[in-house]
């Protein structure tokens, strides 16, 4: 199973953009995670499938950029199956993604708090 937070990716990002810029970008990433959690949690009915596909598609790149490997892998899986029409249990997929968003958020919040 992939890591929640890939420290190597974060270190590489820090070298590329400058360590002083990491807190700002992490705040943006954490805000995205919160918004996605809220949006998915509030969604019901037929809109769930479209939101799940949209959010997973958006998460693929942002999660990869920040080394959120487990979230990225899940987003890629959901996005791929969504494009193939293979998302069978939307409610369960949604709950799994919300859980992973929460775990990722908690993990990255601890990094932000540690940096402060």
Which positions does each model-derived feature cover?
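Long, amphipathic alpha-helical coiled-coil segments characteristic
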Residues: 8-55, 91-112
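Short acidic-hydrophobic sequence patches enriched in Asp/Glu that either
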Residues: 5, 61, 93
């Amino acid at each position: 199973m992939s890591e929640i937070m890939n420290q190597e990716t974060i270190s590489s990002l820090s070298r590329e953009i400058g360590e002083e810029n990491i807190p700002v970008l992490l705040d943006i990433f954490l805000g995205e995670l919160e918004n996605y959690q809220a949006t998915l949690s509030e969604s019901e009915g037929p809109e769930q499938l479209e939101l799940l596909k949209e959010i997973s598609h958006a998460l693929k790149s942002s999660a990869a950029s920040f080394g959120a490997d487990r979230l990225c892998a899940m987003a890629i899986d959901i996005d791929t199956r969504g494009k193939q029409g293979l998302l069978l249990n939307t409610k369960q997929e949604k709950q799994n993604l919300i859980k992973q968003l929460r775990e990722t958020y908690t993990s990255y919040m601890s990094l932000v708090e540690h940096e402060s």
